[in-house]
Regions:
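Conserved, structured C-terminal
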Residues: 1-133
């Protein structure tokens, strides 16, 4: 789901990049240029409750009926009991949490639009309780 064209910030991994301090790493200068700018795209998760829908990746993401991206991966999430997909949602004015949650989403699966639920937190154990048990 992450390619050389995606930043850790867009992929939701900004917490894993040590930007404070002077620790050198490959790509630091490029990340410093975009670190404080609004994100134009963001990796998010979706679930589709229609059991007949099969997510494979490359399905179009619709927000309020407008195409805003596509899934980079999809499949059935056995631990969550639902169809799961991840993809980048794009918007020229930025993709803040408020903008993301204000929309209604659907995925184009085999030519038909299926309602989708946006997931900004991990689908399985979102509070990390199992890992701390």
């Amino acid at each position: 789901d992450i390619t050389p064209n995606d930043t850790p910030f867009e992929a939701g991994l900004g917490w894993a990049v040590k930007m404070k301090g002077d620790t050198p790493f490959i790509g630091r200068a490029a990340l410093e240029q975009v670190a404080n700018q609004p994100l134009k795209k963001r990796l998010v998760g979706f679930t589709v409750s229609d059991s007949a829908a099969v997510l494979l990746g490359r399905e179009t993401i619709l927000r309020n009926g407008e195409s805003v991206g596509y899934l980079t991966s999809g499949g059935y999430g056995f631990t969550v009991g639902n169809n799961v997909g991840f993809g980048y949602v794009r918007h020229d004015n930025g993709v803040s949490d408020d903008w993301l949650t204000a929309g209604q989403y659907a995925l184009i699966i085999a030519g038909d639009a299926h309602p989708a639920k946006l997931c900004l937190r991990p689908l399985y154990d979102p509070d990390g309780l199992r890992i701390r048990a």
